[in-house]
Amino acid sequence: GHGHIDARTEALIFAASRAAHASQVLRPALERGEVVLTDRYIDSSVAYQGAGRNLGTETVRGINEWATAGLQPDLTVLLDVDPADGRRRRTAGDATEDRLESEADEFHARIRGAFLDLAADRPEQYLVLEAHLPVRELAGRILDRVDALLALRQSSSA
């Protein structure tokens, strides 16, 4: 049937989408000297398909690094939320959950653990924030980190 997508296919679809995004959107913008913000990147696949779907984090990382020709972010912002709190937040509105969002809390706990492990392995690249903080506080902390990163980049190119 057309309803179920197996884990490998899902991983490859996300990697293909990321390949197109990197070559058609990210690289051209970076070549123009623009600052690029993007929602979800390689580490999302590592967490969701590698850990969540049990395909192996290194396998999924390798596929995605190849797909994006090694393009890496300067900063990854992780808004951390407990799986049960995340479900409550998602179902509080009228939005219906997608295929990944509707997975069991155990699946989301594996993903959260994978993201926190990635952040612990690369603290210089990650900004981990508690998602329950007020939006203004989250925005302020993110802007502070981005401003520091841009200032560092300007001083190194001067």
Report each predicted region and the residues it spans.
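A glycine- and Lys/Arg-enriched "phosphate-lid" helix/loop adjacent to the NTP-binding pocket
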Residues: 44-113
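Short beta->alpha linker loops
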Residues: 17, 41, 81-82, 130-134
